[in-house]
Amino acid sequence: MSTLRPFFIDTDTASDDAVALVMAFARDDINIVGIGVVAGNVPLASALQNALYTRELCGRTDVPVYAGADRPLIYELGTAQHVHGDDGMGDIGLPLTGRAPNEGHAVDALLEASNEYAGELTLVTLGPLTNIALAIQRDPSIADRISRVVLMGAAADHIGNVNPVAEFNMWVDPHAVQIVLESGLPLEFVGWDISRRDAVIVPEEANRLRSIGTPRAEFTIDIQRIVAEFCARDTKLAGFDMPDPIAMAYAIDPSIATQTRHLNLVTECAEGPTRGMVVMDLLGFTGREPNAVVVMHADHSAFIRQLEAAIS
């Protein structure tokens, strides 16, 4: 086995995804074998440019970045540009054009990585699950080759950020979520509830982190400009929350989770007020076997320490 842990990251790169990538790029104990990009927070072309810019900023052009699905399996794409800005990166004037991804499709790259690193690969998903569902449809045996799948998505308290009960990543492509939940993959969910409670960056923390003064530190805070406005106006948080970075922090160091549960999860695919809701059987009413680990609580201080180390 390799001494480095192989990670494949799938992302719809916008402001919080980019910080999660910064955190992964900073690690010397991880081999990022590929980054797949999917439409979600922003259209695919923008998500690609955001990933490529972040890769360049971190000096990690050795890591391949692949274009994936540009739309959900069935529904039309709905983006979160009202949350992250038109460009997904806070609309602060970054030069987000002109970079080309690696040749090949994200789904093919994921399948190849699952074969090359069978039994070792950690898959981290930061966006809609379209690419993952397509990989499962292509080769269901992928479930036997991946060691961990850490997903940013859903919410154990069933509070939503795109409708009353659905988290955005799950809402965008609920049919993909259903395929993933039924796949047998070893799933570990870090939900929006964890982000709202355990990964909120209050203004004092944001100022301190930015004052580290590195390009990565300034980038990490500056691209949250539109997100911070959204959180103050709509989600009523004391600062801005960091869903994808807390998921990445857990993928890197599972001890950041202070409580987890094994639960049965199903999703609502139908259009309507509960589209994209991931129903977690917290009391075991259904009697169905658990199909996922769900993080219930995380250590905010440990998260901040990991983030600070990555941007210093």
Regions found by a protein language model. Give the residues of each.
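Metal-dependent C-N hydrolase catalytic cores
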Residues: T3, L48-E116, P290-A298, E308-A310
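Conformational coupling and interaction surfaces
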Residues: S2-L4, M23-A24, N31, W171-H175, ...
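Short, mixed-charge, low-aromatic patches
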Residues: T3-T11, P64-D70, M89-D91, T130-I136, ...
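Active-site histidine-anchored catalytic micro-motif
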Residues: S2-L52, D87, G93-R197
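Short, surface-exposed amphipathic charged segments that create phosphate/polyanion-binding patches used
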Residues: G78-G85, N163-E167, E204-A206
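A residue-level signal for conserved active-site and pocket-lining positions in enzyme catalytic cores
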Residues: V65, V180, M248
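Short, functional N-terminal and low-complexity linear motifs
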Residues: D16-M23, I74-Q81, G98-P101, I142-R148, ...
